Amino acid sequence: MNEFDALLARAVEQARALGIPVSARISPRVAVNRRAVTRFGCCIRRGGEYVIELSERLLEAEERACMQTLAHEVLHTCPGCRNHGALWKEYAARMNGAYGYAISR
């Protein structure tokens, strides 16, 4: 397990503690995307499992920035949250209020 993987587990735990219905099918391994230049992260559904990718640029970032990005992507695994609609925004607001994040679209 690397540092991103441990942070992902924490982000999932935080969301579940707030009653946010994140998927039980999130890969525990965070993929590092070495080509991403316009985004910090993404959530991809592959074969019934969600894979979270983070930009290589976050390897040198502070833990808080990584946590916020992971939390953002974890919310996309919730039913009805593939985009940044009202439900996703509601869950982001819960995470922001509880943990001091600034998750936004």
What are these regions (language model features)?
Residues 1-68, 77-105:
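Active-site-proximal or metal-binding-adjacent scaffold patches in catalytic folds
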Residues 73:
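Walker B catalytic acidic pair
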